[in-house]
């Protein structure tokens, strides 16, 4: 448990289930700590190795930290903004409020009200920034290049899986309509019969309300006679190794906040075909690292995947380009440093 006197940045996480926002926090905080940022989390659903405040320690927020005149409350959800506002305005704690917005939709009146009370706002993409009505800084997410990296060992290849074929094409994330899993499966049913060297894998959690959706996809695969070549893996213990096993990754989301999976795939030296949901179009260089199509357009998605399935060497070449692109533009340290600059602008000068 960190000493509240040493904590200058509080990153609340008020959601128990794993989400894209939670994943961002989990990846960012260790990197921020390595950069010397004095940050701690608050809330459930985070790994035990992250510095985590107890709720009772919030009483210590009335006193500024040892080196600064105030702290930064870095919210990423509405409820986290609301708590920050209460702590500052109701209890008069010396806090500066920061919000990171990934949403790509018109905000509700309530969300707009919350955002207007922030001292600074970060947008995770130009597209998400276009929905904000307040000044903001665009800082795109990065990826941990130490965790997501190209194949290094035999276990990183398709042979280690025991699956048929020479190449894997994958779609990862929760299995649901919003994520476009059905569009991927439909494309695989159309393309794989002509290309026996490829096998497709779907990995991700199926929540209770989406079981019928997943069961329908599995039934479609069986009806197509492809149950040995389109596999549903469920949740796997380590998704990173599966990225390394892929020759092509597909991100077919109909709707997305930011969307980290293309970065994770490209960092693993894997070409990517994606919809234009989330920030995907800002991450992928069409014709060099992959391809981007309109969200919800299953036919366009299939057409974009087809050249890679027909020519695996093209996928390999674009995977090499993707790795260089991510290393040059999307290292996690780059994101952490940019956020650190926003923190410093809010914290002000050190206490004398």
Curated annotation (Swiss-Prot):
GO terms for molecular function: glycosyltransferase activity. It is an enzyme of class 2 (transferase). Gene3D superfamilies: Glycogen Phosphorylase B (3.40.50.2000). GO terms for biological process: lipopolysaccharide core region biosynthetic process. Its EC number is 2.4.-.-. Keywords: Glycosyltransferase, Lipopolysaccharide biosynthesis, Transferase. Pathway: Bacterial outer membrane biogenesis; LPS core biosynthesis. It comes from the Bacteria. Acts at transfer of mannose group to a 3-deoxy-D-mono octulonic acid (KDO) via an alpha-1,5 linkage. Belongs to the glycosyltransferase group 1 family. Glycosyltransferase 4 subfamily. This is Lipopolysaccharide core biosynthesis mannosyltransferase LpcC.
